[in-house]
């Protein structure tokens, strides 16, 4: 039907006859001449119909979002009427004929006025929202990114192999989406949270290099960067080590950013241990564009009478830190400090102490804060020296249980960085390594990544003889601008070590056999050293397109309650279907 897309129409086609198809984006009547902006996925082109044209009445009857096909001759626009904002802006099409393919009702919101439209409305009419050039750009970028990744992995010897969607429920952290079996009454499949076990089994099978662009499912509480169904770039390889995975993935991600948005990353990426990340930034996914670091002042506060600081300073499970904001006296108002105090409270902090440094020459008198009177001058100036604080700087303090301080002050660091625009570069990719093997909660051990991550031991004897809380894992995360975009590890390839890890996690031998018997069996049949990584496609595209909402980069996303406003999923099903599955629905008591 068409000969050209809108973006193809330029001055090189002057005098040529073309056919375009698309939507009427805008219609204008100037002195009896009809101007139509025709939109397709590549952009806009201007179509002009003069009153003496046989199709003038048809052109005059067009309204926004009518779908049309038009023929005409490409002409240079009159001098001074060029539009530099569109690729076809130097030319226009003088219309010969036009055909209305389909009319449109008045759309629920104007594409140019989307910011004043509620997200619920945009999600209900997603097919309208996706007509916006901004949304089309994001999904086109997604397509380009996935194409690049496929080509890279194909060219590096990885095989695209599909794994099952109907699989066995296994305890991986989040709740599974369950699918009842009609043939096996009372039994359920689970939609996979990841292809973890299947990709490891492919390594046992000898495929050596695997990848898959795959949907995964987690029935968990949602936030701005989470969806119940999401897409992973899933990768696994045999006879390799951490260095192979990290260097190969650096090349892939650096190439991806250069190919899609023209950004060049220096390689190799910075590498930081988990312990350093937590110590300096309170987070295992720090945004290194923000030049703010924690300074540990625990020892300095141990002998002070100020219990807010000395209490945590003498508690092995707590920490005391300072965070210096250069020029913070002028940049941060009292109102902002009050807001930050409320902000850290979200993470469990009981308050937010601060000191304004007005004058260093005046000693304690030059420091402004409600807490200054409670701390000795010697200690105050030790802290000032440690933090390299200068006049007009402001110091924030975190004191309390280690997790609360890390979470609250880590979040505060990121918020201040954004509020004051402290970013000293556009991009900051890094690897975080040497994660703890386990984390403890409610007096029980949990896998920090997943139960198949290899510990940094060579034998089951080493595993038995090491305090589990001191074990490091062979895991690695890729972080870009404070987002964890990918995570992986070298896997356990020996059956006895895998069985012992299950045991340390409180999984009995019987439960391990029931849930993972097939995996334990496979590990006894000659399993190679192997490892891999998975990247969140949705998060990567968020970074590539500069959005903070994951729903912007998915064609048909769910809401934060995991519903689809357009199709009204989830929905009820008939009693007949439920009976076939042997399911009775228990009505929620109100």
From Swiss-Prot:
It is found in: Cytoplasm. Coiled coil: none annotated. This is Aspartate--tRNA(Asp/Asn) ligase. Pfam families: GAD (PF02938), tRNA-synt_2 (PF00152), tRNA_anti-codon (PF01336). Homodimer. L-aspartate binds at residues 172, 218, 449, 491. Its main location: cytoplasm. GO terms for biological process: aspartyl-tRNA aminoacylation. Aspartyl-tRNA synthetase with relaxed tRNA specificity since it is able to aspartylate not only its cognate tRNA(Asp) but also tRNA(Asn). Reaction proceeds in two steps: L-aspartate is first activated by ATP to form Asp-AMP and then transferred to the acceptor end of tRNA(Asp/Asn). InterPro entries: Aa-tRNA-synt_II, aa-tRNA-synth_II, aa-tRNA-synth_II/BPL/LPL, Asp-tRNA-ligase_1, Asp-tRNA-ligase_1_N, Asp/Asn-tRNA-synth_IIb, AspRS_core, GAD-like_sf. One of its GO terms (molecular function) is aspartate-tRNA(Asn) ligase activity. Its EC number is 6.1.1.23. Belongs to the class-II aminoacyl-tRNA synthetase family. Type 1 subfamily. GO terms for cellular component: cytoplasm. Residues 196-199 are annotated as: Aspartate. PANTHER family: ASPARTATE--TRNA LIGASE, MITOCHONDRIAL, ASPARTYL/LYSYL-TRNA SYNTHETASE. CDD domains: AspRS_core (cd00777), EcAspRS_like_N (cd04317). Keywords: Aminoacyl-tRNA synthetase, ATP-binding, Cytoplasm, Ligase, Nucleotide-binding, Protein biosynthesis. The keyword Ligase applies. It catalyses: tRNA(Asx) + L-aspartate + ATP = L-aspartyl-tRNA(Asx) + AMP + diphosphate. The record marks 30, 80 as: Important for tRNA non-discrimination. ATP binds at residues 218-220, 227, 484, 536-539.
